[in-house]
A protein has these predicted regions:
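Short, Lys/Arg-enriched N-terminal segment that forms or immediately precedes the first helix
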Residues: 1-5
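N-terminal helix-turn-helix DNA-binding core of bacterial DNA-binding proteins
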Residues: 6-7, 11-44, 69-79
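Hydrophobic small-molecule pocket/channel-lining residues, especially in calycin-type beta-barrels
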Residues: 32, 40, 59, 102-106
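Short alpha-helix boundary/capping motifs
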Residues: 33, 44, 59-60, 83-84, ...
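Amphipathic alpha-helical dimerization/coiled-coil segments
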Residues: 18-22, 74-106
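Short, hydrophobic-biased segments on the C-terminal half of alpha helices
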Residues: 52-53
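Beta-hairpin "wing" of winged helix-turn-helix
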Residues: 56-67, 73
Length: 106
C-alpha cells in the first residue's frame, strides 16, 4: 500500500502521472519538456528519470522499447489502494452531478 502513497508524495511525480494520463506513451525527453512547459517544473532528464524509477517500482509505469525509443506507459490500477483509502475518509465520496448543470437540450 505504501508504494502508491510514496509514488504520489512528490509534486513532480504527480505531474508525470497527470501528463501520462492526458497523453500516454511518452519518451523521457517528451516528459521532461512537457513538465517544463505545462507545469513549470525545470527538471533535468536525470531528475525526471529518477522520478520515473519510483513510479515504475510502485507499479504505476511500465516501459517499452520501440526501436531505439523508450516510451513510458501509465497504469493507474496501482493507485487502487490510495483510492480505497481516500474513499473511507468522510467527505470524500463522489458527488452526484448537479441536475441544474445539465447542458442537454430537450
Amino acid at each position: 500500500m505504501d508504494d502508491g502513497f510514496t509514488a504520489i508524495a512528490h509534486p513532480a511525480r504527480r505531474a508525470v502521472i497527470g501528463e501520462l494520463a492526458e497523453r500516454n506513451d511518452q519518451t523521457l525527453f517528451e516528459l521532461t519538456i512537457r513538465l517544463l512547459e505545462r507545469y513549470d517544473l525545470p527538471l533535468t532528464r536525470q531528475a525526471v528519470a529518477k522520478h520515473i524509477v519510483v513510479l515504475r517500482e510502485a507499479g504505476l509505469l511500465t516501459v517499452s522499447t520501440r526501436g531505439r525509443t523508450t516510451v513510458h506507459h501509465l497504469h493507474t490500477d496501482a493507485l487502487a489502494p490510495v483510492r480505497d483509502w481516500l474513499a473511507r475518509l468522510p467527505g470524500t465520496e463522489p458527488h452526484p452531478p448537479d441536475p441544474r448543470s445539465d447542458t442537454t437540450q430537450e
